[in-house]
């Protein structure tokens, strides 16, 4: 069941305090480690590390699993996502495209799909997998921003089982802020984060990422210019958030 997130309209003081906070000194190290670890995982078995349900995915099964994700998280939510726009007229952004599992399924539905990933090897494999889809594009980003996408504007952004691996809430928030910059006004960023704070995490761990509480999610939305309208799965690994650009 979806429920609405409450938020405080004016967080000017909190915004000022946040802006005055210097980035954590190990941020660059974490980003480098994320890229290095995910490149290694991609070379070892990209599809397994994208979806650990199987260690020997066939092409058909792997991309069908992406279709299931889209069926469960996108097709059931088209009113919030499309907002009256025809899907084939929409440009969609996927954060953490991996080997193109979900990207391909999104491209079957929307007019243009752009995926980004921090891993060079994941992006290489995704580009090969999507070569037959001229309206699907993938780029490697640096983990700090989305300047690689230039001045494109997007109608919807999506991310599934990606942020749950990021060891720093600061890095996740940088992504959220950059997505806000690229979305049209009113558009939705639907994404999932790690919500289970009972799990032991480490800044060096690029598999089990930093958890978010409901309060932390709301505060992040407000700092980044979003309305945090809905949430589902708080306290679990699959904590879904619906952020609408103000």
Regions found by a protein language model. Name each.
Residues 124, 160-164, 177:
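Internal, well-ordered alpha-helical scaffold/interface segments
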Residues 156-170:
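A short SAM/SAH-binding and catalytic strip from SAM-dependent methyltransferases
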Residues 10-146, 169-170, 188-246:
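Class I (Rossmann-like) S-adenosyl-L-methionine-dependent methyltransferase catalytic domain
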């Amino acid at each position: 069941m979806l429920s609405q997130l409450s938020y405080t309209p004016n967080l000017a003081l909190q915004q000022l305090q946040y802006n005055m906070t210097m980035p954590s000194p190990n941020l660059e190290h974490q980003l480098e480690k994320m890229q290095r670890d995910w490149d290694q995982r991609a070379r070892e078995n990209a599809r397994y590390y994208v979806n650990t349900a199987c260690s020997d995915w066939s092409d058909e099964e792997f991309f069908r699993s992406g279709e299931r994700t889209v069926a469960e998280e996108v097709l059931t939510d088209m009113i919030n996502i499309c907002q009256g726009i025809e899907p084939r007229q929409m440009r969609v952004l996927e954060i953490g495209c991996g080997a193109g599992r979900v990207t391909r399924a999104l491209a079957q539905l929307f007019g243009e799909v752009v995926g980004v990933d921090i891993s060079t090897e994941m992006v290489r494999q995704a580009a090969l997998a999507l070569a037959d889809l001229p309206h699907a594009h993938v780029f490697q980003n640096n983990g700090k921003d989305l300047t690689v996408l230039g001045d494109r504007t997007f109608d919807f952004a999506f991310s599934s089982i990606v942020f749950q691996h990021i060891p720093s809430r600061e890095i996740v928030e940088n992504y959220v802020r950059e997505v806000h910059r690229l979305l049209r006004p009113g558009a939705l960023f639907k994404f999932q984060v790690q919500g289970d704070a009972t799990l032991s995490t480490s800044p060096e761990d690029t598999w089990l990422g930093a958890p978010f509480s409901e309060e932390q999610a709301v505060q992040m939305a407000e700092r980044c210019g979003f309305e945090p309208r809905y949430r589902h799965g708080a306290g679990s690994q699959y904590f879904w958030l619906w952020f609408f650009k103000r």
